[in-house]
């Protein structure tokens, strides 16, 4: 299995799209962000995966994908406080992150489902971390840095 570093070295899972294929994937990504009535968590997961797969930038595609997840979850009311830190999860389970991204890039229904499940786990872990931090702040035990 591959680690998170391998995903970053290759800048994404699967074959890197070029030219018209890249333009089409990016257009689809923009449309997906604005689709109404789509399940918010599924939309956020697919947007993240598409940033990894399309990789429009020379670096930072994974970070942009994780940022978009946080933005979409807040915008769509899934986690309106913005305190969930789901973007920490990939660093905690880098192999699972790389494997889930690879599964998505396979293009199979099973791969897409595996990715969405992974993203849901990341959101849950982020909510749990936010709760832990909020409790520490309330108890006066949280220290910066």
Ranges and model annotations:
Residues 1-145:
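FIC/Doc superfamily catalytic core
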């Amino acid at each position: 299995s591959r680690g998170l570093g391998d995903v970053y070295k290759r800048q994404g899972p699967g074959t890197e799209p070029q030219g018209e294929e890249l333009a089409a994937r990016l257009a689809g990504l923009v449309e997906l962000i604005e689709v109404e009535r789509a399940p918010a968590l599924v939309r956020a997961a697919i947007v993240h995966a598409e940033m990894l797969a399309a990789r429009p930038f020379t670096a930072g595609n994974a970070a942009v994908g994780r940022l978009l997840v946080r933005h979409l979850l807040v915008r769509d009311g899934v986690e309106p406080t913005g305190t969930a830190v789901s973007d920490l999860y990939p660093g905690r389970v880098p192999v699972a992150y790389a494997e889930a991204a690879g599964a998505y890039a396979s293009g199979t229904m099973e791969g897409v489902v595996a990715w969405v499940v992974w993203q849901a786990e990341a959101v849950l872990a982020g909510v749990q971390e936010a709760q832990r931090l909020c409790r520490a702040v309330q108890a006066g035990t949280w220290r910066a840095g």
